[in-house]
Every structure is written in C-alpha cells, then in structure tokens.
Regions:
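Hydrophobic transmembrane signal anchors and adjacent membrane-proximal interface regions, especially
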Residues: 3-5, 16, 78-85, 129, ...
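Second-shell loop/turn segments in exported
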Residues: 25-32, 97-99, 145-148
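Disordered inhibitory propeptide/activation segment of secreted metzincin zinc metalloprotease zymogens
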Residues: 1-33, 41-45
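Short alpha-helical interface patches
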Residues: 5-11, 58-60, 159-160
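Metalloprotease/metallohydrolase-associated module, dominated by Zn2+-dependent proteases
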Residues: 103, 123-166
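Residue-level detector of conserved, well-ordered beta-strand and adjacent loop positions
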Residues: 26, 66, 141
Length: 166
C-alpha cells in the first residue's frame, strides 16, 4: 500500500459513507461517458466489496457525478472533488469540466480517487510526500499522458484495498 497516497481527512470523511457497504450514487445526465463511470463503480465494487446503488434523485445520493462548464470559477480547473455534509450525511460531489478533453476518463478516475480517500502524490500536508520512481504510477498525479491507459495503476489499487479491505 502506498501510504503516501492516503489522505487521512478524505478517508475519515468517506468512512461513514462506506461503513454500511452501500453508497447511494447519482450520475447526472450531463456526464459522458456514463459507461466508463459505471465501469469504475463496478470495478470498485468487486475490489472492495461495496455496492454502488444508483438513485434517481441527487438529493438522496452520497456520491454524485457532474459535468459542468466552469468549476469553482477557475477556467483552468478540469476536475474537483467536494466533500460536504448534507441531509443524508457525508456526501461527495465530483465535478468534471464539460469541454471535450481527451483526458476526461483520467479526470473521472482521479476525482473518484479523492472520494476513496486518496491524495495527490506531491501533497505534503501530512509529511508523506511520494518518493516513488515516478508519479506516473498513480492516477492521483497530474501527469496524464495522451498515450496513457485510463485505469487505476498498481499503486492506486494497492492503496484502495489497503484502506478498505479487511
């Protein structure tokens, strides 16, 4: 497990959501590609034994996916994961910019990684900056390359299972 990729605040915020084994999930109609988002959820279900249950109303969801034209009034932002407390408890909104970018799948994986409790490899807020060979070894880096395959890396999978399995 790459402890350098664990964000204790994110992990702590997500823990109550995953503790009952079900995550009520909403994918907004603006999101593309929906199939890829469902693949991420299905893979994670099998990996850590969590059921991502689709809900029709976003107000009932604990995890929400959106595509919007402008994120946090920052034209350079392409994605953002926002944890907050709602009437259903701890909740995450994951935003991806609507512009047709070739890295959109990568951004969905990256923001979903935050939901799962992961941080950027270069974050040193908890004194555990990544010293691996390459930050390309994780979707939590900003080192997306157009030739990259769009899926979790071994370091990501090891970190996710280390946090959430047994």
């Amino acid at each position: 497990m790459a402890v350098e990729l664990i964000s204790q605040p994110y992990y702590g915020f997500t823990y109550p959501i995953l503790s009952d084994g079900v995550v009520k999930t909403f994918i907004h109609k603006s999101c593309e590609p929906k199939g890829f988002i469902r693949d991420i959820l299905s893979f994670t279900e099998n990996l850590i034994g969590i059921d991502f249950k689709a809900v029709k109303k976003q107000r009932n969801a604990e995890l929400k996916f959106f595509e919007i034209p402008l994120i946090a009034n920052e034209p350079t932002y392409v994605g953002l994961a926002v944890p907050y407390v709602s009437r259903v408890g701890n909740t995450w909104n994951l935003y991806v910019k609507t512009n047709p970018v070739s890295s959109k799948k990568w951004i969905y994986l990256h923001e979903f990684g935050h939901f799962l409790g992961m941080e950027h490899p270069f974050d040193d807020n908890d004194n555990d900056v990544w010293y691996g060979e390459s930050t390309n070894d994780t979707v939590m880096s900003y080192n997306y390359q157009p030739s990259s395959y769009w899926w979790f890396r071994r370091a990501d999978i090891d970190t996710i299972t280390g946090m959430w399995v047994g």
